């Protein structure tokens, strides 16, 4: 289970991640990853000794539409994704926002396939951070 600080709840948080993040689809999932940049004024300030900065943890949210299946199937897919993301959330930079959207084929996919597709999508989204498309 994700902690309360790690979950996306408000629609504005989901919208910000989807609109501002990188979108990558792999297999049965589509990942929207938004990694905040470091503001230029933050890097110019020297760090104070003995003061540890508290950064917001990486947060995740899930979108599983009715196209995936009935409520039982959707909740099963959501539980699997939540378990898989919990293990991978610590590898994301602090302050990141991750939205995982399950495609209809996720209802029939195994947990191993969901995990492999999720890993591939997150890796591709992180690799795209330096590139600009268009």
Curated annotation (Swiss-Prot):
One of its GO terms (cellular component) is ribonuclease P complex. It catalyses: Endonucleolytic cleavage of RNA, removing 5'-extranucleotides from tRNA precursor. GO terms for molecular function: 3'-tRNA processing endoribonuclease activity; ribonuclease P activity; tRNA binding. Gene3D superfamilies: 3.30.230.10. The keyword Aminoacyl-tRNA synthetase does not apply. Keywords: Endonuclease, Hydrolase, Nuclease, RNA-binding, tRNA processing. Its EC number is 3.1.26.5. It holds the Pfam family Ribonuclease_P. GO terms for biological process: tRNA 5'-leader removal. Belongs to the RnpA family. Consists of a catalytic RNA component (M1 or rnpB) and a protein subunit. RNaseP catalyzes the removal of the 5'-leader sequence from pre-tRNA to produce the mature 5'-terminus. It can also cleave other RNA substrates such as 4.5S RNA. The protein component plays an auxiliary but essential role in vivo by binding to the 5'-leader sequence and broadening the substrate specificity of the ribozyme. This is Ribonuclease P protein component. The lineage of its organism: Bacteria, Bacillati, Actinomycetota, Actinomycetes, Micromonosporales.
């Amino acid at each position: 289970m994700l902690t309360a600080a790690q979950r996306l709840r408000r629609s504005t948080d989901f919208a910000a991640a989807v609109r501002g993040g990188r979108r990558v689809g792999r297999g049965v999932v589509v990942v929207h990853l938004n990694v905040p940049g470091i503001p230029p004024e933050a890097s110019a300030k020297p760090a104070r000794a003995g003061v540890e900065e508290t950064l917001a943890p990486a947060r995740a949210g899930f979108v599983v539409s009715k196209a995936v299946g009935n409520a039982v199937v959707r909740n099963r897919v959501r539980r699997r994704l939540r378990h898989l993301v919990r293990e991978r959330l610590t590898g994301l930079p602090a302050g990141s926002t991750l939205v995982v959207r399950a495609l209809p084929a996720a209802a029939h996919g195994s947990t191993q396939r969901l995990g492999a597709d999720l890993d591939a999508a997150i890796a591709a989204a992180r690799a795209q951070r330096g590139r600009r498309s268009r």
